[in-house]
């Protein structure tokens, strides 16, 4: 799972067991840091750009009623593959959620609720088959203790740990992935997977430019 501006998942089938033949899947779950960072900037009057370590959110109280209402929104009812971004979960979306939280909401409570919202979105997606055994987390959100705590509480039965626990620096994984994609292109191997991209068929990605 990548917890960047948007939370997205890639499901890899296990090497053995009842789900070993499950297809590779990937999709965008919903907002992560896109809403959190905007909220921090708003609550701090522009002094802060993100909630370092999730310390601010850890001090707040979660509005679970609002979270359950938000989970009923159309995007979260769509089946994968699906993709989203700040055009849906940006400033206008934050404004609406802050109105629903109330003008007198404490910043810590607002951040705690938005943080738990991201975890609830991910947990809802992971509750659907196939069963997930292990979840490796990358992106800036993996350093947010409030978010990681909420993920552990809501994704019970799933072994959850940061990507660097298996020796891959979360800050380097995208560079490694693009290097692998480039290598596959040089070998003329297909890298696009319709189960992830939603395309009609797989194919080679990128263009080779010779000097």
Show where each model-derived region lies.
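Glycine-rich phosphate-binding/hydrolytic loop that grips phosphoryl groups
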Residues: 112, 116, 164-211
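A short glycine/serine-rich beta->alpha loop
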Residues: 23-26, 105-106, 163-170
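Phosphate/pyrophosphate-binding loops at sites that engage ATP/ADP/AMP, CoA/4′-phosphopantetheine
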Residues: 123-133
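Generic structural signal for residues in well-ordered beta-strands
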Residues: 159-160
